[in-house]
């Protein structure tokens, strides 16, 4: 049995949220999801402190990099491992996200979902059970 951990996944795609929730839960995680940045801010400002925060970049309300900037300014999750999971491969966006202390930047199209989970856990230095 691996370490117990919490994950908050933020994406505007409900299908992907559901799929990734199931995959992380199979690895023993407690998972919460937020459909878009506004919902994520409500959860984080309400006291959610996930071990791992996974953010999409391309979202209709506030993009993931802007969301991350707000999260950092408000010091909402200073101890969470933040990982971008997106199809955005624009180098400027990647560099801006890195400037806010992300631990990883995963391009969705380059991994199958189970590999995404493995990569996230590897980045977060957590053991898969």
Question: Which residues does each predicted region cover?
Answer:
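Helix N-cap/capping motif at the beta->alpha junctions
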Residues: 33-42, 64
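Receiver (REC) domain active-site loop signature in two-component systems and cognate sites
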Residues: 59
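Short amphipathic alpha-helix used as the core "switch/output" element in two-component signaling
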Residues: 42, 65-78
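Charged docking surfaces used in two-component/phosphorelay signaling
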Residues: 18-26
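As written
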Residues: 64, 98-104
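Active-site beta3 strand of CheY-like receiver
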Residues: 48-54
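Active-site residues of response regulator receiver
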Residues: 56, 86
């Amino acid at each position: 049995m691996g370490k117990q951990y919490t994950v908050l996944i933020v994406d505007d795609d409900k299908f992907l949220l559901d799929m990734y929730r199931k995959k992380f839960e199979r690895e023993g995680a407690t998972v919460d999801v937020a459909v878009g940045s506004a919902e994520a801010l409500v959860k984080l400002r309400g006291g959610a402190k996930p071990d791992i925060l996974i953010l999409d970049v391309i979202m209709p309300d506030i993009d993931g990099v802007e969301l991350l900037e707000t999260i950092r300014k408000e010091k909402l999750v200073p101890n969470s491992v933040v990982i971008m999971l997106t199809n955005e491969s624009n180098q400027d966006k990647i560099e801006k996200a890195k400037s806010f202390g992300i631990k990883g930047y995963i391009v969705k199209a380059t991994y199958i979902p189970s590999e995404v989970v493995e990569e996230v856990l590897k980045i977060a230095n957590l053991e898969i059970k």
